[in-house]
């Protein structure tokens, strides 16, 4: 009798992707984050679905409906905080996953990488629109400030902003459309993730050495399924500790004040996972320049395959590049810190230096280090 998982048209796809997939025998825990991102996405879609059952996308009742979810709905508070903090876990996994790709040279799989660069953009757009929905002070002013950035686009900017707003300010029309988009986007992300996986399975996974592992492959199940389950348990443990002990740790207290267009909060800042990009935006005095730098801070990842000058794929045996990589990580942490600080001395100059350093590292120093390492190999 033939095995149904190998003959059934649907099960065959699942089998080839998650069970009999030939996988390098030496991939480390840094390769867990792909599956963790999948778990995060499923968790966000499920909790979001239950929240949408009780939420009303109207300026007069949105804030009250979120309060109602937390106070009156059965386990509404846990669903709400799992959704809010689940976004933070999602971005932690996303940053780790991208960092792994940079460190081990996974970007040489260009199709997989390019879809993988579109995914953070889609995720950031979704998270931004979701942050607007509770209709607190930071929701309203965050939406106003960030959408207003589009007005920096020459000629069509102002019309574009008013078109997105659905009026002359952030109002009911804006909230309704943001809710609609926030609902549909995770499914677009899921579709993109499937394409991402499709391209990955054309080439097979990379591994820490960056050398072809065709001679040494093992089946994905049971070896990596059990490893992924461990990662998933640790992820859920971290999420539940956050949700049950300090659910508001990563939130902004201003968002517990209902939105008021007549009263601007002293410091408008986005959620922590946008702060590095926000710091880059603020470090440039020109509005259009800032917006371009903001977009380029993530879009620059598209150039990674072109900027790869090393004869080796992975950074495993490249100490100079390793050093620069960890400086880049420290630089991003600095930018994240600066993004949450007020615009005053010395934060302005630190932010500007960190922003210059960010682009300098990726565009100049890392390719130079690779060239130096290539020459050192000749000795």
Swiss-Prot record:
GO CC entries: mitochondrial inner membrane; respiratory chain complex III
Keywords: Electron transport, Heme, Iron, Membrane, Metal-binding, Mitochondrion, Mitochondrion inner membrane, Respiratory chain, Transmembrane, Transmembrane helix, Transport, Ubiquinone
InterPro entries reported for this sequence: Cyt_b/b6_C, Cyt_b/b6_C_sf, Cyt_b/b6_N, Cytb/b6-like_sf, Cytochrome_b, Cytochrome_b_C_euk/bac, Cytochrome_b_N_euk/bac, Di-haem_cyt_TM
The protein's required cofactors: heme b
Keyword Transferase: no
Record's subcellular location: Mitochondrion inner membrane
Keyword Nucleotide-binding: no
Transmembrane parts of this sequence: 33-53, 77-98, 113-133, 178-198, 226-246, 288-308, 320-340, 347-367
Residues the record lists as binding a ubiquinone: 201
GO terms, molecular function: metal ion binding; ubiquinol-cytochrome-c reductase activity
GO BP terms: mitochondrial electron transport, ubiquinol to cytochrome c
Cofactor: how bound: Binds 2 heme b groups non-covalently.
Membrane topology term: Multi-pass membrane protein
Function: Component of the ubiquinol-cytochrome c reductase complex (complex III or cytochrome b-c1 complex) that is part of the mitochondrial respiratory chain. The b-c1 complex mediates electron transfer from ubiquinol to cytochrome c. Contributes to the generation of a proton gradient across the mitochondrial membrane that is then used for ATP synthesis.
Family per similarity comment: Belongs to the cytochrome b family.
Protein name per UniProt: Cytochrome b
Organism of this sequence: Cephalophus dorsalis (Bay duiker)
């Amino acid at each position: 009798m033939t095995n149904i998982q190998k003959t059934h048209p649907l099960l065959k796809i699942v089998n080839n992707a998650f069970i009999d997939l030939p996988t390098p025998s030496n991939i480390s825990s840094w390769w867990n984050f792909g599956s963790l991102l999948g778990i995060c996405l499923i968790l966000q879609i499920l909790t979001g679905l239950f929240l949408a059952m009780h939420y009303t996308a109207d300026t007069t009742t949105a804030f009250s409906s979120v309060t109602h979810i937390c106070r009156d709905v059965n386990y509404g508070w846990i669903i709400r905080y799992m959704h809010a903090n689940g976004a933070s876990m999602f971005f932690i996994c996303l940053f780790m996953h991208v960092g792994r790709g940079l460190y081990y040279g996974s970007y040489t799989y260009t199709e997989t990488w390019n879809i993988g660069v579109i995914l953070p953009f889609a995720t950031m757009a979704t998270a931004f629109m979701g942050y607007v929905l509770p209709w607190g002070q930071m929701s309203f002013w965050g939406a106003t400030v960030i959408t207003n950035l589009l007005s920096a686009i020459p000629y069509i900017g102002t019309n574009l902003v008013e078109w997105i707003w659905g009026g002359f300010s952030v109002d009911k029309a804006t909230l309704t459309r943001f809710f609609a988009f926030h609902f549909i986007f995770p499914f677009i992300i899921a579709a993109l993730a499937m394409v991402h996986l499709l391209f990955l399975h054309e080439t097979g996974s990379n591994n820490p050495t960056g050398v072809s592992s065709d001679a040494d492959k093992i089946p994905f199940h049971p070896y990596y399924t059990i490893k992924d389950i461990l990662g998933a348990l640790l992820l859920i443990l971290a999420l539940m500790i956050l949700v049950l002990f300090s659910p508001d740790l990563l939130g902004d207290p201003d968002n517990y004040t209902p939105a008021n267009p007549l009263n601007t909060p002293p410091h408008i800042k986005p959620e922590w996972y946008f702060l590095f990009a926000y710091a880059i935006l603020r470090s440039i005095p020109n509005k259009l320049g800032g917006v371009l730098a903001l977009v380029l801070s993530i879009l620059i990842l598209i150039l990674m395959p072109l900027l790869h000058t090393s004869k080796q794929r992975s950074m495993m045996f490249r100490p100079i590049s390793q050093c620069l990589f960890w400086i880049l990580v420290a630089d991003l942490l600095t930018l994240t810190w600066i993004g949450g600080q007020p615009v005053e001395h010395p934060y302005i100059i630190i932010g500007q230096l960190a922003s210059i350093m960010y682009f300098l590292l990726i565009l100049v120093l890392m390719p130079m280090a690779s060239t130096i390492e290539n020459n050192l190999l000749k000795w």
